[in-house]
Every structure is written in C-alpha cells, then in structure tokens.
Amino acid sequence: MHRPARDTHDTRAVHDTGDTRAAHDYDLLVRDSQLLVIDDATEIPGGWVALRDGRVAAVGGPGTEPAGVARTVSAAGRLVTPGLINTHHHLYQNLTRSFAPAVNGTLFNWLTTLYPLWSALDAEAVHLSTYVGIAELLMGGCTTSMDHLYVHPRPRLVDAEIRTAREVGFRFHATRGSMTRSVEDGGLPPRSVTQTDDEVLADSERVVTTYHDPSPGALIRVALAPCSPFSVTKELMRETAELAERLDVRLHTHLAEDRDEEAFCQETHGCRPVEYFESVGWMTDRTWVAHCIYPNDEERARLAAAGVGVAHCPSSNMLIGGGTAAIGEMRALGMPVGIGCDGSASTDHASLWMETRGALLLARYRGGPAAMAARDALDMATRGSARCLGRDDELGHLRPGACGDLVVWNTHEVALAGSFTDPVEAWLRCGPSRAWTTIVAGRVLVDRGEPQLPALEEKLREHARVARRIQRLT
C-alpha cells in the first residue's frame, strides 16, 4: 500500500468537529478507500470520511469507522479526493461546440465568428446549457464551478443559470459578465450582445443583492466579471472594481490571453494589459483572472504581490495556439493558481480531470519531469482553485469542518491495470477520466459513474434542439 512520506496522519484517530451529538450520528460515510487524500500534506491509506449537515465531520483510518450512519458508500479500494474546483468556464458555449467555421481561427477570429450565433441566447438556452454543463462537470469530478456569462442579448440570463444550479444542488459561483464595446465602438462583438455601462452596473448590483450568499458553506455566490480589457470601457472596469469593493464580492476577467489583446491595449490605452489592469483598480486580492499567458517577469511579480489569482486553462490555450502560462513561475511566487475548463466551444469539453491532466503535461513539457507531479496538479485543481475563489478555508480539502464535497475515482478500470505503487500518479497518468461517485454538500450527485439527474435525458434532447437553432442548422 502506498504511504507517502508526508503522511503524518494517525490512522487510528477520528477527528470530529466537536458537535455535541453522538460521534456516530452521521448522514453519510465513505469508507474502504484505497487512499483518502485529505489535502496536499495528509493522506490516509484505507481511509474513510464521514459527513454531517453537508460538511466533513470526521476522518480516520481502517478499523475506526463510525456506526449508525444514515447512508454508507463503499469506495471498495478506490481513490478518494476532495472535489475538483473549476475556476473559469462559459457554460452557454456548449451550444456551439466544435463549430466548424470557427475551429481553425485565432482568438479574435473565433470570437467574431461565434458572437452572431450567441446573440440568439435566451433563458431556455441558458437553462439547458447550464444543466447539461453541470452534469458534465459532475461526471469529471467537479463539485464547484464558476461560470462567466458575458453575452447578454436578453435580460436576466444569469438568473436562469443560478436557478438551474440550485435545481441540481451544485456549488456554483455565477459571475455577472459584461461587454459594452461593440464593433461600432472599436470592439469585436455586434451591438446585439452588448449593453451600456449603466445597464451593466445596475444589473450587477441586482444580481449580487438577489443571489450572493456570503455565509459559510454557501452553494451560490456571485462575482463581477467584465469580459476583457478589449470588450468594455475603461470607466466600466474602474466602476466595477469600486462596486465589488462596496458589495464585498470578487472580481474576474480574462487577462493577457493573446498577443492580439496585447496589441489592442497598446493601441487603445497606450500600455500593456497588466499595466491597464492595474490602472483601473483591479490589482487586488479579491481578483482572479483567466489565462494570464503573456505577462513578463516584472508584471508577474506585481500580480503576485497584490494576491491576484490565475485560472490556468491548458486545453483551450493549446487548441487555439495561444501560448502556455508560466504556471511554475507563478506558483513559486505564491500566486493562487487554479484550474479552469474555459468555454465549452473552445475547450470543447467540461472535464476538470482532463484539464488537470493537461496542466500536468504542459508543466512537464515546459520544465521537465521535476516541474510538476500528479499531487501538485491535484493541489492546483482543489486548494489552488479554492484560493482563487476566496474559499480555501472550506473548499479544496477534506479536513473536518470543510464542505462535504468529494469524489471517489474508479481505480479498477482497464486503463489502470497494473498501477499499484502510487494511486494518485496513476489517477492522472492512466485515468480514470470519469468520476465513480461525486458528492456535493453531502449529496450523492454521481453514483457508479452515472449522474443522479432524472431529467438529464430529456434535457439533452431539448439541448440538441436549441443548439441546432442557435447554430442555424434548422
């Protein structure tokens, strides 16, 4: 049995949160693991985890399992980890996956091809894309995801995705995205998917005051997220930062993703993207950004000093040929670095397992085999992502008191045959690409590899109908 040198856990002990009820009064027990990963420093061979009221109440080693639980899930010798956390996504884009006219373009070509299609988005389309996207995320072991919805051809689309996440019981960080610079204003999108600064600010405050839940263990939170430096006005960037400060919510945007963005900022604002980002008040520890491929060494140091987090999106950047983020250097500077799927029309999937594996491969391609191990990649997809969302106290680990979000991975698959010496390395090198059990807030949402969503088949049929309409195929 694999026992990492850093495992100092007393496998005989049961660590409880101190609840006054009986120690065996638990809602759910996951037992008989091959290896239980608590966090980046603690692993328990054969470990178990008990949940109560949607949180981790106790963990322990073989032979110390509590009795009297309401439901028991046998891991049956499988790997158990904290749930993976997605720090950058565009769920609505699964309605235009692998759209042939866009797949071989640059970032700006890709966007200008798809913007006219996305102008057909409505509440039904957002609901269906969110439902199907969450199902896919759950199957890939994701228990928390943000979503960056920045196309608003119709009002209250963010409301539709929040209602859908609540319906499923998924932990969801909605972001009120925005675009205000249409092609007529020197931007890229058509007027049909943009709004005025005043419209964006008013609705941003409405969404936060209506839906944002700052309480511990919250399933729904809201952040503010102008799309990018080239898609909104300077005034909106600055006023959004001020609004986030007043409402005490987080900030998100795309930053330094593409050389075209760099040229745009130089031509429009007379400075590089990071300098512009700092000038509008975004250089703060309430901010995390997507991609961050092209900052230079001095800019990375300034971002790190400010506590800005980064959502690393390896697949979309590789598919579009957009470059590779210097993740090793960022982590060495202490920056919060998490994993993001990015859009389902750029990455063309919503598997955080695949993105975590992609991060491992890219890091080793850039820096050699010592640059990253599977545990480092897992730490990025859990604790690192939780830091980006400002929730590393309760997400990204399985210490008692944490939110009850965890995944059982099937290490008995054909793809893992012969892998005996290190289950974490085998998990990311060999497979599995699909979760066996996914638990969110103590609720089993994937069981034996199947999403526990009775409406999924019907939603898939409806999704296909709407996707064909949006792609103008009917």
Regions found by a protein language model. Name each.
Residues R97-R171, L201-P216, A464-V466, R472:
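Alpha-helical scaffold segments that flank or form the walls of functional sites
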Residues L95-V126, R181-D197, A218, R259-R286, ...:
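Active-site gating loops and adjacent loop-to-helix segments of metal-dependent hydrolytic enzymes
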Residues R156-C292:
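Metal-coordinating catalytic core of metallo-dependent amide/deamination hydrolases
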Residues S279-R286, G328-E413, C430:
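His/Asp/Glu-enriched, well-ordered alpha-helical/loop segment
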Residues G169, A241-R250, W282-D285, R302-A311, ...:
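Glycine-enriched alpha-helix->loop->beta-strand junction motifs that scaffold or abut catalytic
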Residues M1-G47, R52, T382-T474:
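Active-site microenvironment of metallo-dependent hydrolases
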Residues S33, V49, G54, G77, ...:
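Divalent metal-coordination and catalytic microenvironments
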